[in-house]
Amino acid sequence: MAAHGMSTYALDLRGHGNSPGQRGYVDAWSQWTDDASAFVKQIEAIVGTEVVPLGHSFGGATVLSTVLAGKLPKSKRFIVSSPALKVKVAVPGWKITLGNAMSKLMPRFALDAPAHGSLLSRIPEVAEVYDHDPLVHGRMSSRLYTEWQQATRDIVARAGQIKIPFLILAGSDDNLIDPSGSRDLHAQAPLTSELRVFEGRLHEPFNDLGSEEVFQVIADWLRMK
């Protein structure tokens, strides 16, 4: 975005990246929305100009929940990329039942749910870097899973209540997060949302072939609104 004269500031969700906490664990989804709210407010205080929240995957779902919770009062618009609203591969019913039980009994119990880099990007170098990144853990706790599922249901059910414009980005060939979830989101908020599905792209539209088009779409949308 720097090439378009726009600055970016990044936050690692707790339990991920360089942020503290057990890998892939939160006590409650609201911890992520509180973190997102605090981060955006901090950046707003630093830059003194409009800050447009952008969330990718889990971050996309988090931004949506944060907006719906009224925790981004100064935000006039926002962007979500491949928002984690619907997984591509259906989870068996017995796993859902087990996850719900474990969330109550052993909330910190976690399983590996690795995603290979080839599922994220068609650029071999990007995939290789991802596969060897020590900050990538692929862990998901039972509590995070149930909190996430509840959050996605709430987002889709209440998306029509979003009053500010937002842009939804998705890859047509995303094999991790089903792009139909983005379509459902847009269908629930047709007056405030704009959906762009990029043909042939995978889960990481910013790190895939033709990423320049994605950045251009964002820049044009920000300048237009």
Region locations from a protein language model:
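Catalytic active-site module of serine/aspartate enzymes centered on a nucleophile-bearing elbow/loop
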Residues: 192-225
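Conserved alpha/beta-hydrolase
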Residues: 1-21
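Short alpha-helix in the alpha/beta-hydrolase fold that links the catalytic acid
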Residues: 164, 178-187
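Short beta-strand/loop motif that positions the catalytic acidic residue
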Residues: 162, 168-170, 174
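Alpha/beta-hydrolase active-site loop signature
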Residues: 13-17, 85, 202
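Alpha/beta-hydrolase-fold enzymes
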Residues: 54-141
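Catalytic nucleophile-loop/oxyanion-hole region of alpha/beta-hydrolase
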Residues: 17-47
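Active-site nucleophile elbow and catalytic-triad environment of alpha/beta-hydrolase enzymes
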Residues: 140-158
